[in-house]
Amino acid sequence: MPEAEKLATVSIEDVQARQDSRRIPINKVGIKDIRHPVRVGGRDGQEQHTVANFSMYVNLPQHFKGTHMSRFVQILEGHDTEITVQSFREMLHEVAERLEAESGHIEMAFPLFVRKTAPVTGVQSLMDYQVAFIGEIHEGEPELAIRVVVPVTSLCPCSKEISRYGAHNQRSHVTVTAKTRDLLWVEDLIDLVEEEASCELYGLLKRPDEKYVTERAYENPKFVEDLVRDVAIRLNDEDRVLAYNVTAENFESIHNHSAFAEIEHDKTGEPRR
């Protein structure tokens, strides 16, 4: 009999299952930053192949020495189908059940590509957005949040007001983390943010498009404070969002530092609008 088969027939002690005498529970234990290919479902009904970074954790009671690390990878290997918000919830349940835990946490971070059309010439190009699905489950009750980083253009109202011509503008990152009630597409959040910026970004622009976006930003100046407030208003009006955190970081073109603003709001218990 081959040596591997001999080992398979021998009962090997499960060290992780030993009792631990220190009697200190662990809030989160698991695997961090494991890369795995996934297929993500989109609003247009198409799926997109990408590579995601997964971090997967469970709680560990005080009487157990360790958790079963290999089971996290087994769960990932079992999800080779398209990942949607619904299947992500199912993965949360599976983690808690397979690891026999009261609570679990999964974060799946990945780049999402969206095909955009230039505003004047109609030329198409891809834009990438950093997205994360963040899930928590406790005693069988899952909660899901979506985080997306949306690059936009911001133009300074003060610079426009005091200058004889021109105004300083820069690329900004608006990050929205939204706890959701019902199905909310990542693309819905991207659209919401881009509509509130001085101007949205594109992967490819021709000269007529560049003229348009330059003038669009000039006609729509916003401080970093304006940006987070306007996005917050839109999120307040979105019934599918239960709670949110929105930040804006302007990579200032006339300073060697960024401008930053943040709003956090929990809508739980508020009547639907």
Curated annotation (Swiss-Prot):
Pathway linked to the protein: Cofactor biosynthesis; 7,8-dihydroneopterin triphosphate biosynthesis; 7,8-dihydroneopterin triphosphate from GTP: step 1/1
Alphabetically ordered keywords of this record: Hydrolase
Gene3D superfamilies in UniProt: Urate Oxidase (3.10.270.10)
TM segment ranges: none
Single GO MF annotation: GTP cyclohydrolase I activity
Catalytic reaction(s) noted: GTP + H2O = 7,8-dihydroneopterin 3'-triphosphate + formate + H(+)
Key word Transmembrane present: no
Pfam name, any one: GCHY-1
Enzyme superclass (EC): hydrolase
Signal peptide (residue range): none
Known role: Converts GTP to 7,8-dihydroneopterin triphosphate.
NCBIfam families on file: PRK13674.1-1
Family: Belongs to the GTP cyclohydrolase IV family.
Designated name of the protein: GTP cyclohydrolase FolE2
Lineage: Bacteria, Pseudomonadati, Pseudomonadota, Gammaproteobacteria, Chromatiales
